[in-house]
Amino acid sequence: MSRSQNLRHNVINQVIDDMARGHIPSPLPSQSALAEMYNISRTTVRHILSHLRECGVLTQVGNDYVIARKPDHDDGFACTTASMSEQNKVFEQAFFTMINQRQLRPGETFSELQLARAAGVSPVVVREYLLKFGRYNLIHSEKRGQWSMKQFDQSYAEQLFELREMLETHSLQHFLNLPDHDPRWLQAKTMLERHRLLRDNIGNSFRMFSQLDRDFHSLLLSAADNIFFDQSLEIISVIFHFHYQWDESDLKQRNIIAVDEHMTILSALICRSDLDATLALRNHLNSAKQSMIRSINENTRYAH
């Protein structure tokens, strides 16, 4: 089976699981929204919709897809036989999606087998991935095969942002010095357009920001061409968006502000304005830091 088929089958299994849990509304979100939710292309989304329609799970009504019946496991595919490295990538995507869609919450316990079935990967892959995150005090091993999500305090958030500021300001300087022919300049323009599209439709799509945020910071850090920076982004993204799901009281407004801040950074970057880009990035990081600290303090107050 090709890698694209493995990805498609695993995402189909994940969509089926999300439908069964009631995490996906009917009619379904737009194809572009689904692509953002699952970090896949719209071509893959169309293949998934076609499969679920043929199975009788979905019915097309005009341009919308409506859930015709509750899906079951027979509508999906057997667990992937992809290589371990491919399964790692599949689970990383699935883990991030679970956090973004509030399927994993602070204080909840879950099993390696439960996550492996949801993502369609080997439990060994899940265990290795969770052990890596365990070192950052994001999750805690309760007993063999069982884990729980942890809460962290203001000191943890400040340390996280200290690392983030060092990595991203360093990467920004590298980006500003990229040669004109580097493909990342075109990617920056595309990224700016993606932000414009989300801003124009943010009323119903503000939850889609987390994947866009991850892509934005990934592009920025890529300019450093440092594998350790890329690995740090993985941890930071999960912690940052996992924590933000706890307090949804002003999530929409926070995301609107962050989209505007990203656009200011990208515009200055594309214009090669070193000072404006640096100031915009520092402002964005400080804004995000203060927002997270407020959220932590609110959660601490309610906990008591």
Curated annotation (Swiss-Prot):
Q: Which SMART domains match?
A: FCD
The annotated consequence of gene deletion is: Cells lacking this gene fail to grow on L-galactonate as sole carbon source.
Q: Name one GO molecular function term.
A: DNA-binding transcription factor activity
> What does the UniProt induction comment state?
Highly up-regulated during growth on L-galactonate.
Does the keyword Iron feature in the UniProt annotation? Answer: no
DNA-binding region per UniProt:
31-50
Q: Which UniProt keywords apply?
A: Activator, DNA-binding, Transcription, Transcription regulation
InterPro entries in UniProt: GntR_C, TF_FadR/GntR_C, Tscrpt_reg_HTH_GntR, WH-like_DNA-bd_sf, WH_DNA-bd_sf
UniProt xrefs under Pfam families? FCD (PF07729)
Domain HTH gntR-type intervals: 1-70
Q: Which GO terms describe its biological process?
A: galactonate catabolic process; regulation of DNA-templated transcription
Query: Does this UniProt record's set of keywords contain Transcription?
Result: yes
The function of this protein is: May be a positive transcriptional regulator for lgoD and/or lgoT. Is essential for growth on L-galactonate as the sole carbon source.
Q: Know the name of this protein?
A: Probable HTH-type transcriptional regulator LgoR
